[in-house]
Amino acid sequence: MISVYSISLGCPKNRVDTEWLLGVLGPEVRPVREMADADLVLINTCGFIAPAVEESVRTVVEAVAELEDLPRRPLLAVAGCLVGRYGRQDLAAELPEVDLWLTNRDMDAWPEMIGRALGVAVHVPPVRLLSTGPSYAYLKVSDGCGHNCSFCTIPSIRGGLVSTPADVLEAEAVNLLSRGVKELIFVAQDVAAYGRDMGLRHGLRSLLDRLLPLDGLERLRLMYLYPAGLDAGLLRYLRDAGKPFVPYFDIPVQHAHPDVLSRMGRPFARNPREVVDRVRDVFPEAALRTSIIVGFPGETQQHYDHLTRFVQDVRFMHLGVFAYRAEEGTPAAGMPGQVDEVEKDWRRDALMEVQAEISEEILEGFTGSDEDVLVDAAHEEWPGLHVGRTWFQAPEIDGVTYISGPGVKPGAMVRAEIVESRTYDLVALS
């Protein structure tokens, strides 16, 4: 039996990597809640932006300090984007207490490195150790990125696009569904680009052809769809496919003004409203999510006002707004017209206030309706209350539906009436 204390920072793709890494240690893995009880302490880091780097470094330093006081010191392994961005050698010089540094680019070697350090046999292919509960799981369909946005560090950290073969993903999906998972969520740096590195023109459609008919799959959700890849043909395919696909579209437009988009090096720089209209032409009731960066170098008040009007006009159901931070080694960090930090934060907060009103109005429209709620977990504080999600709520990043009543338990799909709405959350009774 191997006791593991794990921390996964950053995006769902990191969570999948953590689950996979724990899976290579085989069926004898036992997750623990305290470092003192662990044989292995695993920290999977994020290095995408400066605040994530700071959080990752702080987490590692705090772990080192806690381990120093233990009578029996577990193995400390640090993996992920922080290692890929700054390199083993430099990090090891600063933090020699870490036993293993693991980069995403040598992920295939992780099993051997971990197994050798622990003195255990590894299991390849592994069975993922799920950390998301019984209801949903992420399926990472590719790694790396083929785009070159001027603000982004991902290509330098994770490399170019590498799609996972469809037969491997199908086998993983079958395994996850056999364990009771009801919702699969595709994640990648750009899900719409799946298969391009393999020479496939319609790679995502080919993958969906294999996965949508699988027994036990009740929801399939696509995240991280770059605007340029969401063409009319793919949308028609998704419409014709129907359930279990849910018409939830996560489309990171990043900005709305063509001047800013051009400096960002973004595809679809002319008018992101075109892709919104394209989706709504095929799916009038689609749930739309996007992410926005404010305060990008050269963003004027006029650019920001244009962006605000865009958000007000489109009325995204879900919106994430981030203040631009200059990342070392990116073209944008050296661009003229850097915006004052206080101004960037003000623009972010003001745009989120606009979105809060939009979200509240949209969710109020669901009051009195019946929706299928996938129950994720029991509420941590209120007995009898559970936390779940409708089809238009993705885990971890969107609001939730608080639900109670007959048949409500983790992993269940329950028909329920929406009885109350809040700014970002719903309340339902089965």
Curated annotation (Swiss-Prot):
It is found in: Cytoplasm. One of its GO terms (biological process) is tRNA modification. It catalyses: L-aspartate(89)-[ribosomal protein uS12]-hydrogen + (sulfur carrier)-SH + AH2 + 2 S-adenosyl-L-methionine = 3-methylsulfanyl-L-aspartate(89)-[ribosomal protein uS12]-hydrogen + (sulfur carrier)-H + 5'-deoxyadenosine + L-methionine + A + S-adenosyl-L-homocysteine + 2 H(+). Residues 131-361 form the Radical SAM core domain. [4Fe-4S] cluster 1 binds at C11, C46, C81. Its EC number is 2.8.4.4. Residues 364-430 form the TRAM domain. It comes from the Bacteria. The keyword S-adenosyl-L-methionine applies. Its main location: cytoplasm. One of its GO terms (cellular component) is cytosol. The keyword Chloroplast does not apply. Its cofactor is [4Fe-4S] cluster. PROSITE patterns: MTTASE_N, MTTASE_RADICAL, RADICAL_SAM, TRAM. PANTHER family: RIBOSOMAL PROTEIN S12 METHYLTHIOTRANSFERASE RIMO, RIBOSOMAL PROTEIN US12 METHYLTHIOTRANSFERASE RIMO. NCBIfam families: 30S ribosomal protein S12 methylthiotransferase RimO, MiaB/RimO family radical SAM methylthiotransferase. Catalyzes the methylthiolation of an aspartic acid residue of ribosomal protein uS12. Belongs to the methylthiotransferase family. RimO subfamily. This is Ribosomal protein uS12 methylthiotransferase RimO. It comes from Oleidesulfovibrio alaskensis (strain ATCC BAA-1058 / DSM 17464 / G20).
